[in-house]
Amino acid sequence: MSSIIRKVISTSKAPAAIGAYSQAVLVDRTIYVSGQIGMDPSSGQLVPGGVAEEAKQALKNLGEILKAAGCDFTNVVKTTVLLADINDFGTVNEIYKTYFQGNLPARAAYQVAALPKGSRIEIEAIAVQGPFTTAGL
């Protein structure tokens, strides 16, 4: 049996992990990206402006990690969106769909009691290194 590749993915263009975890892990061709909040990687602080600005920054951070793994948003097959207030879903969805277009990933969204650093949003993702072929059912 051949061994499976496992590699930690890291970039200084996204916030460093604030706990005992990696920004992302590549296993074979699948990338598991840890939850990203709206933290500015240079300051280590949440961006000001509320959930909309935090969502943009979280997605920017996600994009930088994907790029470090040789991917982009088109490689994402599943996301999980955690919200401090589910009433922010509409606002977040408008921003989300500017990053994900065409063949959209599967997604789950939940309201949670609290998020790291008082964030209003956290987004995690699973991506697969391409290339892809779109098939009909």
UniProtKB/Swiss-Prot annotation:
Record organism: Rattus norvegicus
Record bears the keyword Mitochondrion: yes
Similarity field: Belongs to the RutC family.
Positions where N6-succinyllysine occurs in the chain: 13, 60, 67
CDD domains, alphabetized: YjgF_YER057c_UK114_family
GO biological process: one example: lipid metabolic process
Top-rank EC class of the record's enzyme: hydrolase
Gene: Rida
InterPro entries linked to this entry: RidA, RidA_CS, RutC-like_sf, YjgF/YER057c/UK114
Residues bearing the modification Phosphothreonine: 74
GO molecular function: 2-iminobutanoate deaminase activity; 2-iminopropanoate deaminase activity; cation binding; deaminase activity; identical protein binding; long-chain fatty acid binding; mRNA binding; RNA endonuclease activity, producing 3'-phosphomonoesters
Localization annotation: Cytoplasm; Nucleus; Peroxisome; Mitochondrion
Protein name (Swiss-Prot/TrEMBL): 2-iminobutanoate/2-iminopropanoate deaminase
UniProt cross-references to PANTHER family, sorted A to Z: 2-IMINOBUTANOATE/2-IMINOPROPANOATE DEAMINASE RIDA (PTHR11803), 2-IMINOBUTANOATE_2-IMINOPROPANOATE DEAMINASE (PTHR11803:SF53)
GO CC field: cytoplasm; cytosol; mitochondrial matrix; mitochondrion; nucleus; peroxisome
Pfam families the record matches: Ribonuc_L-PSP
SUPFAM superfamilies cross-referenced by the UniProt entry: YjgF-like (SSF55298)
EC id: 3.5.99.10
Stretches of the chain forming a coiled coil according to its record: none
